């Protein structure tokens, strides 16, 4: 036979209230079986099944989510489709690629062309070979995507950048002209709305490219970048140990200088009422996917969530925020702190 036991937890009493007046948190617990001769503890490896043993083992985990701001209902009601813009489809609209010594190299063979690869791991690679996919092409394919049941379209980064992948952002306030620029994004959003398809953008807010308006290592932009002068308005957006060539970068990759979100001006540029996050929500996107979200601070995520949700109050669809978090986002510890991505007020997924 089997013994069946039921356990009721009063989560309100368990959680208490945090500083914001919410009941949420991550809790660890074990069940004890007390017998005449000994006490056994549960040991759960997967948070579902368990074995009994004399020592503590691994605890069950209980994530209590603040229900005051739930995940948008529309998210998850259809297929989510990811598009890597340069390799999806060439559209008929106008485009303009960067030229010059650091400009784009076009690959004419869409079906069989092979982009350059580094000979050895760690070798530098330009990543400036383009196959010609653009936002016009994405818009032209919406009828096909709708027939597949797609209701959410998640795009790879579209902001102006040197590379084909655009994870080295050059200007957060400009859609890359090689992808069709502002006109192509507006056309895509307008058509997607008619098809009932939500569009999510990829936000790379942990770092920029070194070839950016803000760092401007190569003098591509008219602004004085942090690399060019210690008097640059963007100097404190980055962390230099020895200006100009020693600075914090994403995983030590020098072409991706890391942004200093401890600087209020830098952080507000993304998270403020008129910041990047809110600006594009008001323009018509349905949400953001945050690149390397586990490297963004709690302050950044809290403020970004608040500004994006507030901007969404003006639109018909509540915006969603998705984060790239390696390992288990419900219980992850990053940079010495237990993170609260999924407890409410930061990430929806």
Regions found by a protein language model. Give the residues of each.
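Short, solvent-exposed loop/turn segments at the edges of secondary structure
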Residues: 76, 167-170, 252-254, 283, ...
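Short acidic catalytic loops
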Residues: 83, 149-158, 172, 198-205, ...
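N-terminal structural segment of carbohydrate-active enzymes
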Residues: 1-198, 213
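A generic secondary-structure signal
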Residues: 141-144, 191, 275-279, 307-311
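Active-site-adjacent "subsite" loops/lids of carbohydrate-active enzymes
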Residues: 213-283, 293-294
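Aromatic/hydrophobic pocket-lining residues that form the small-molecule binding cavity
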Residues: 138, 181, 185, 266-273, ...
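Aromatic- and acidic-residue-enriched segments that line the glycan-binding/catalytic groove
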Residues: 92-108, 164-176, 205-248, 334-347
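Active-site-proximal helices and loops of the catalytic beta/alpha 8
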Residues: 189-198, 206-207, 212-223, 286, ...
């Amino acid at each position: 036979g089997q013994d069946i036991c039921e356990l009721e937890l009063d989560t309100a009493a368990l959680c208490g209230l945090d500083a914001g007046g919410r009941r949420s948190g991550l809790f660890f617990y074990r069940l004890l079986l007390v017998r005449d001769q000994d006490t056994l503890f549960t040991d759960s490896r997967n948070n579902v099944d368990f074995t009994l043993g004399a020592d503590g083992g691994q605890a069950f985990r209980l994530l209590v989510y603040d229900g005051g701001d739930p995940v948008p209902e529309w998210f998850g009601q259809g297929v989510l489709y990811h598009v890597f813009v340069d390799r999806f489809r060439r559209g008929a609209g106008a485009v303009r690629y960067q030229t010059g010594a650091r400009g784009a190299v076009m690959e004419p063979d869409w079906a069989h062309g092979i982009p350059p690869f580094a000979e050895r791991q760690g070798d530098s690679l330009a990543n400036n070979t383009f196959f010609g996919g653009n936002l016009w092409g994405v818009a032209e394919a919406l009828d096909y995507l709708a027939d597949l049941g797609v209701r959410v379209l998640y795009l790879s980064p579209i902001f102006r950048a040197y590379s084909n992948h655009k994870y080295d952002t050059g200007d957060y306030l400009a859609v890359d002209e090689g992808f069709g620029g502002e006109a192509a994004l507006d056309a895509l959003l307008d058509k997607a709305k008619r098809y009932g398809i939500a569009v999510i953008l990829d936000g790379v807010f942990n770092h920029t490219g070194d070839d950016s308006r803000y760092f401007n290592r190569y003098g591509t932009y008219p602004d004085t970048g942090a690399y060019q002068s210690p008097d640059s308005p963007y100097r404190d957006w980055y962390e230099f140990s020895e200006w100009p060539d020693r600075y914090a970068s994403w995983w030590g990759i020098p072409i991706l200088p890391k942004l200093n979100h401890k600087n209020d001006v830098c952080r507000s540029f993304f998270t403020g009422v008129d910041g990047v996050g809110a600006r594009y929500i008001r323009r018509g996107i349905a949400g953001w996917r945050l690149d390397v979200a586990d490297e963004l601070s709690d302050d950044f995520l809290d403020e970004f969530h608040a500004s994006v949700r507030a901007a969404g109050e003006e639109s018909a669809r509540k915006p969603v925020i998705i984060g790239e978090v390696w390992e288990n986002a419900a219980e992850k510890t990053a940079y010495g702190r237990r993170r609260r991505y999924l407890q409410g007020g930061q990430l929806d997924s």
